[in-house]
């Protein structure tokens, strides 16, 4: 949830676009505790879906009914009934034994699945995992999310900075840019953290990295626990952020969902300043172009200039008047751990928060299942971990 800020901006911009939902009770509850709820904004942005060369609004029940791709017959009825069932049921345990691919083809039908859901799965999980993800993931996505999207006044970096200052005022020591190299249990109890070549003793340690990073940090974990960590799959993310001289979407659309089959070099285009005003960014129009990818994809090795040459021309398919000269600045951010991949019966494979090493705890986005990753569930699992640590 890190951000960055240009000198002429009043607000920060996130490196990897995200937002809160109106249903995010853990995150909003924390903000209530801190007395900062009044700084949460819930604008009403517009989301669109690509179909046969055009973009159509798709962010409400009415817009879904009017979406031309489904027609007016049985396909639209099956789409609506499946969506209604998934919102009403709480039996995610029964769903996780089935893949999204198999379950949706059976109940929504091949046509509806291939038009509406398969592009999402291909975009999120790539060719390797798209047909392996279990149905509980889709259930949780539809169950928890709302059309209202929230952000924090000043940007999420402003929230992080305020929280840091608040914690320090309570006597909490926070060390930035201090990477831990290894975590080792001590014979007399407790843990030793190697930091900059020095061993520092601690009674307890909560690791919040990816599962693979924990395995590298704590090789003293039992082999079966280490193997379980390394078997968990995830997708990386590549996000290009652009500041433009003028708005890209003439209609004021915020989120463009783009299927891989459409031939765009990214999964989504998100015009942040159609969500919050460009006045917060000195009049700049902020645009994200992002994709979920496996870490061996070429986007993880191409330079920013090489990616710009690929990303800019397709923007003319959104606005034919777009020109590269509109771009004032660009920033490229990549992460190897962005989207956990929950396979069939994933609940059996989730590592416990309390690891087999006394005093060592683990809380990550791979453990908030069946829910999808997000700051809301980071707060929830953080509270659970704190309760276990006493």
Where on the chain are the PLM-derived regions?
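FAD-binding beta-loop-beta segment adjacent to the flavin cofactor pocket
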Residues: 134, 276-282, 335-362, 366-369
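A conserved FAD-binding loop/helix module that cradles the flavin
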Residues: 365-389
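Conserved N-terminal glycine-rich FAD pyrophosphate-binding loop of Rossmann-like flavoproteins
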Residues: 1-19
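Mid-domain catalytic core of redox enzymes
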Residues: 179-287, 292-301, 305, 310-321, ...
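Short beta-strand to alpha-helix junction loop
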Residues: 18-25, 92-100, 108, 143-166, ...
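A short coil-to-beta-strand element that immediately follows conserved catalytic motifs
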Residues: 41-42, 237, 251, 322-334
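Helical element adjacent to the flavin cofactor pocket in flavoenzyme catalytic cores
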Residues: 137-195, 203-204, 208
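Mobile amphipathic helical/loop "lid" adjacent to a hydrophobic cofactor/ligand pocket
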Residues: 11, 23-135, 140-147
């Amino acid at each position: 949830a890190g951000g960055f800020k240009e000198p002429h901006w009043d607000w920060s911009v996130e490196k990897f676009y995200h937002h809160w939902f109106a249903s995010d009770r853990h995150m909003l509850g924390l903000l209530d505790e801190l007395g900062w709820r009044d700084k949460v904004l819930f604008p009403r942005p517009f989301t669109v879906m690509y179909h046969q060369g055009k973009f159509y609004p798709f962010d409400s029940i009415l817009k879904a009914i009017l979406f031309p791709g489904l027609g007016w017959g049985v396909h639209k009825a099956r789409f609506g009934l499946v969506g209604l069932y998934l919102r009403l049921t709480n039996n995610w345990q029964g769903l996780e034994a089935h893949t999204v691919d198999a379950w949706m083809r059976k109940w929504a039908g091949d046509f509806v699945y291939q038009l509406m859901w398969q592009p999402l799965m291909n975009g999120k999980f790539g060719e390797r995992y798209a047909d392996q993800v279990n149905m509980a993931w889709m259930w949780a996505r539809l169950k928890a999310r709302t059309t209202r999207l929230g952000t924090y006044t000043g940007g999420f970096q402003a929230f992080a900075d305020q929280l840091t200052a608040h914690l320090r005022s309570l006597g909490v020591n926070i060390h930035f840019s201090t990477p831990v190299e290894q975590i080792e249990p001590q014979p007399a109890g407790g843990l030793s953290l190697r930091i900059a070549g020095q061993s520092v003793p601690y009674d307890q340690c909560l690791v919040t990295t990816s599962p693979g990073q924990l395995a590298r940090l704590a090789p003293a974990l039992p082999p079966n626990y280490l193997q379980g960590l390394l078997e968990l799959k995830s997708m990386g993310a590549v996000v290009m952020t652009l500041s433009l001289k003028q708005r890209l979407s003439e209609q004021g659309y915020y989120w463009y969902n783009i299927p891989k089959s459409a031939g765009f070099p990214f999964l989504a285009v998100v015009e942040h300043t159609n969500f919050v005003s460009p006045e917060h960014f000195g009049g700049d129009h902020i645009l994200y172009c992002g994709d979920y990818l496996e870490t061996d994809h070429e986007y993880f090795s191409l330079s920013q200039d090489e990616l710009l040459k690929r990303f800019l021309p397709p923007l003319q398919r959104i606005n034919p008047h777009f020109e590269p000269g509109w771009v004032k600045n660009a920033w490229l951010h990549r992460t190897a751990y962005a989207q956990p991949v929950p396979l069939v019966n994933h609940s059996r494979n989730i590592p416990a928060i309390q690891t087999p090493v006394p005093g060592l705890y683990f809380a990550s986005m791979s453990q908030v299942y069946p829910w999808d990753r997000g700051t809301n569930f980071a707060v929830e699992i953080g509270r659970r971990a704190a309760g276990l640590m006493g």
